[in-house]
Amino acid sequence: MKIGCDLVSIARIEKIYQKHGEKFLDKFLDTDEQKLFKTSSSLAGLWAAKEAASKALGVGISLECSFFDIKISKDSKNAPKLDFSQKILKNFKVQTASLSISHDFGFAMAVVIVG
């Protein structure tokens, strides 16, 4: 098992979104993921989740793992769910993945465990 985590300032993500709008969203979220964006906190949580997932793989966001190789959705209980592209599943031999996202005191944090 490997663990990745990321902590991001919600204000920082909000500022980037205000400056770049949809272009910022299109850079790291697919159309389904963009529907999860309701507030600056949720947007920062999505950013942190993708960063944490890439760190759990040991490569960060890179040619080996792009933002679009990581898919965030919600499960039947509305908890965040993490899926990887077939490329990632094969190259990193991922069998399981767990994601937790939290927001508090102006920060969003995500923790990912892959096995």
Give a label for each model feature.
Residues 1-115:
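Core catalytic alpha/beta fold that binds nucleotide/phospho-ligands
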